[in-house]
C-alpha cells in the first residue's frame, strides 16, 4: 500500500513539473495553429485578370483548377463549378452558371449564351456569347470538391464610349433610378467608375456631376478651372460621394458599345420638324437614332458629319471626328445644339437601321 501511494505522489509531481510551462488558465484564450503539410489541396487560378471584348461579341473568361492527387479523399467527390457576377458595389453576387458532372444550370439573361469551354479536365473557363452591355463587370469562378474550395475573379471589359447625359428638363433633374432608365432609353447603360476613369484618362472633361452604377456621384476634369473644382487643383475624377437614390438629383454618365446596324444622316430635300424626322426615318426602313448610337458611331467608327440633326430624345446634335473651321474647330466631339421646340423646321435627322 505504501509503495502504491509513493508511486502516485511521484507521478503527480512529474506531471506538475512538465505541464506547468504549457498550462493555460481557463479564463485566457488559447490559439491553436494548424499548418497543412503540403499547402492547399485545391487551387483555382485565372490566367488573365482582365479580358476585353465588345457588345455582340464572344469572350472566354479563363479559369483553371489544380488538385493534389495524393491528398486524402482526392477524386472521391464530384467537382462543382460555379460562376457568379459581382455587383458594382460588391454587396451581392448574381448567379450565372453552375455545373456538377452532367448537371448544368444557367441563370437569368445568360440562358442560352454561356457554357464551359472544357478544353481539359481541369478547365473551368466560361464562354459568353452575344455579349450585352449588362455583361460588363467582374465574375467569380468557384470550384468545390468535397470540403475543399477556391475562387478566382476575372474582369470583363467592353470596348465602348462614356458620355454625359441630361434630359429635356435640364441639368440635375434625375434621381438614380431615372438616370439608369435614361441611359437604357438611349441604347446605353449607366457607367461604372472604372469606365468613367478610363474615359477621363482618354480626355473626357465634364463639369457637371453625374450618377454612376455604384450609386456614387462624380465628374471628370482634365482641365481644372475655377467653376470646376478650383483652378489650382490637380486633374482627376471628382467624387461627390453617395447620395439618396430617390431624392437626390444629378445628371448621369452612360456607357455604350458597338452596335449591329447602320447609323447615318438621312439625305432629305428639306429641313424637318421632330415628328417629320421620325417619319422620314421610318419611311427609309429605319428608326430615328438614339444618343448612344451617335456617340458609338463617332467614337468607335470615326463618323463625321457637320450637319445638326434630330435624335430620338428630342435633342439636336452632330458628330465631328475631324475638327475644322465652323465644325468644332477646337476638338473632336459630339456637338450638342440643345433641345429645341419640336415644331421648328430647322434640322435634318440621324437614323439607325438595325441588321437582322
Swiss-Prot record:
Disulfide bonds join 63-141, 183-254, 207-228, 281-351, 306-327. One of its GO terms (cellular component) is extracellular region. InterPro entries: C-type_lectin-like/link_sf, CTDL_fold, Hyaluronan_bind_Proteoglycan, Ig-like_dom, Ig-like_dom_sf, Ig-like_fold, Ig_sub, Ig_V-set. Residues 161-256, 261-353 form the Link domain. Ubiquitously expressed. Pfam families: V-set, Xlink. GO terms for molecular function: hyaluronic acid binding. It comes from the Eukaryota. Glycans are attached at residue 58. GO terms for biological process: cell adhesion. It is found in: Secreted, Extracellular space, Extracellular matrix. Residues 40-154 form the Ig-like V-type domain. Keywords: Disulfide bond, Extracellular matrix, Glycoprotein, Hyaluronic acid, Immunoglobulin domain, Repeat, Secreted. Residues 1-9 form a propeptide. CDD domains: Ig_LP_like (cd05877), Link_domain_HAPLN_module_1 (cd03518), Link_domain_HAPLN_module_2 (cd03519). PROSITE patterns: IG_LIKE, LINK_1, LINK_2. Belongs to the HAPLN family. Stabilizes the aggregates of proteoglycan monomers with hyaluronic acid in the extracellular cartilage matrix. This is Hyaluronan and proteoglycan link protein 1. The gene is Hapln1.
Amino acid at each position: 500500500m505504501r509503495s502504491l501511494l509513493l508511486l502516485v505522489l511521484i507521478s503527480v509531481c512529474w506531471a506538475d513539473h512538465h505541464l506547468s510551462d504549457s498550462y493555460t488558465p481557463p479564463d485566457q484564450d488559447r490559439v491553436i495553429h494548424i499548418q497543412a503539410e503540403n499547402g492547399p489541396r485545391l487551387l483555382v487560378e485565372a490566367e488573365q485578370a482582365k479580358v476585353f471584348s465588345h457588345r455582340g461579341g464572344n469572350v472566354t473568361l479563363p479559369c483553371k483548377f489544380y488538385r493534389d492527387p495524393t491528398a486524402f479523399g482526392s477524386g472521391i467527390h464530384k467537382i462543382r463549378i460555379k460562376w457568379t457576377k459581382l455587383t458594382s458595389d460588391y454587396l451581392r453576387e448574381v448567379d450565372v452558371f453552375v455545373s456538377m458532372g452532367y448537371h448544368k444550370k444557367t441563370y437569368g439573361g445568360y440562358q442560352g449564351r454561356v457554357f464551359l469551354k472544357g478544353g481539359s479536365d481541369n478547365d473551368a473557363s466560361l464562354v459568353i456569347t452575344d455579349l450585352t452591355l449588362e455583361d460588363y463587370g467582374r465574375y467569380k469562378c468557384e470550384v468545390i470538391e468535397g470540403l475543399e474550395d477556391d475562387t478566382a475573379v476575372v474582369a470583363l471589359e467592353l470596348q465602348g464610349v462614356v458620355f454625359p447625359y441630361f434630359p429635356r428638363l435640364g441639368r440635375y433633374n434625375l434621381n438614380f433610378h431615372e438616370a439608369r432608365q435614361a441611359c437604357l432609353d438611349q441604347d446605353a447603360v449607366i457607367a461604372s467608375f472604372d469606365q468613367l476613369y478610363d474615359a477621363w484618362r482618354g480626355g473626357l472633361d465634364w463639369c457637371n456631376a453625374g450618377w454612376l452604377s455604384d450609386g456614387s456621384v462624380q465628374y471628370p476634369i482634365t482641365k481644372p478651372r475655377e467653376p470646376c473644382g478650383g483652378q489650382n487643383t490637380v486633374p482627376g475624377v471628382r467624387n461627390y460621394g453617395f447620395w439618396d437614390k430617390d431624392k437626390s438629383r444629378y445628371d448621369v454618365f452612360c456607357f455604350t458599345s458597338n452596335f449591329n446596324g447602320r447609323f447615318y444622316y438621312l439625305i432629305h430635300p428639306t429641313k424637318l420638324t421632330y415628328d417629320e424626322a421620325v417619319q422620314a426615318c421610318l419611311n427609309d426602313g429605319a428608326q430615328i437614332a438614339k444618343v448612344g448610337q451617335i456617340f458609338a458611331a463617332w467614337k468607335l467608327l470615326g463618323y463625321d458629319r457637320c450637319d445638326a440633326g434630330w435624335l430620338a430624345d428630342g435633342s439636336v446634335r452632330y458628330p465631328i471626328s475631324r475638327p475644322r473651321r465652323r465644325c468644332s474647330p477646337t476638338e473632336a466631339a459630339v456637338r450638342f445644339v440643345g433641345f429645341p421646340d419640336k415644331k421648328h423646321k430647322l434640322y435634318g435627322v440621324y437614323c439607325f437601321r438595325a441588321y437582322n
